[in-house]
Amino acid sequence: MGYEKSPRPLARGGSPQRVRLVHGDNRGYGVTMSPQVFENLSDLSRLPWFDLHDGRLVVSDQSVAPVIDMHTHIALAYLLPMRVDLYRATPHTEHYLPACCRIDFEVYQNKNFTPAALSTLKRDLTLGSLSRGGMRATHTVPNLVREMDELGIVHSVLLPIELPYISKNAVHALDAARREPKVISFGSVHPIVDRVGTRLDEQAHAGARGVKVHPAVQLIMPDHPRAMALYRHCGARNLPVLLHCGPVGIELQSGRRRTQVALYEKPIAEEPRTTFVLGHAGALQMEQALDLACRYPNVWLELSGQSLANVRTILERADPERVVYGSDCPFYHQAIGIAKVLMATVGREHLRAKVLYQNAARLLGLQRSRHNA
């Protein structure tokens, strides 16, 4: 059995290409005949699950929904108060990977950045964080919800990142979740601040469904004693910890040193009551993260950024009950990660609902739906 879609001209020239996805290689898993490289974001509409509506990429196959995105952000602010209007809709969301960029599913996702786009990203996240403009001005709640609605995403999880005493990103994310029912928020407490347990209780009372930890941004080793104490507090409160896990290749050397997957085993092993979701599934060290997930039942893998081949490997070898979809929006359009899950599950569609919805719903304690009844 296969899926076919009529040829569509490529946006940057080239020959029309028919997409044909067939299932059933010699292991019984899905195989993508073509394509794995797309000329731009709109070119994903050549896949059988997507189409273009008024120039915007949408999911056209209603069987894909519902979806939960476990890894999203709105604009973050440090040093100065938040200057972006988080509730302002703009005509377009400026993703850090621009919609015009070529997208290669065979590589880790950030390998698709051009030098110019990467430079713009870094400038927007650093100096731009002090302003009310730039790309960050489009990283708002209504823009996120618009993209969700176009793709069948019923919930997106916001992941705020705090630095000691100079940010209130968790406050803004939790406020967004209170205002917008399609948004869920994790909390964030920097491990070195005082009253960690009290702060976690306050955030949980405000609606936090878990805690985000980013060793590279928060400048702390994942196995630091204060980080270990934070994980222990989270486990006692049944708050899953979503960790940025693994080097991504574009961070500072200090960040690369703090995100080596080997450093995550100590907290995982010593805090078995705590659920650890390894963001980006270990990034460029996917095999090491997959090994942790195979050896420890308190480890989940979140797929944002991974190549199509790595998504297939994870779904083949990991416990499919502990794998979740994430996009890392607004770094990337939410459709990119969905497309990889759909392509990786051709011929084993029973895994789709687990990865796209059921597992995240269970982790977040959401009510049962028709997809996990």
Language-model features: where?
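Histidine-centered divalent metal-coordination motifs
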Residues: 71-77, 244, 280
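Ligand-binding grooves and catalytic loops that recognize ribose/phosphate and carbohydrate rings
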Residues: 198-208, 213-230, 248-251, 257, ...
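Active-site neighborhood of phospho(di)ester-bond hydrolases with catalytic His/Asp-centered motifs
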Residues: 68-70, 159, 186-187, 276-279, ...
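Glycine-biased, low-complexity coil/linker segments
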Residues: 12-13
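Mid-to-C-terminal alpha-helical segments outside catalytic/metal-binding sites
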Residues: 18-66, 80-84, 88-132, 139-146, ...
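Active-site gating/metal-coordination segments in enzymes
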Residues: 44, 150-243, 247
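Conserved, mostly hydrophobic/aromatic
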Residues: 71, 148, 234, 301, ...
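Catalytic pocket-lining loop regions of alpha/beta-barrel enzymes
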Residues: 208-213, 220-324, 371
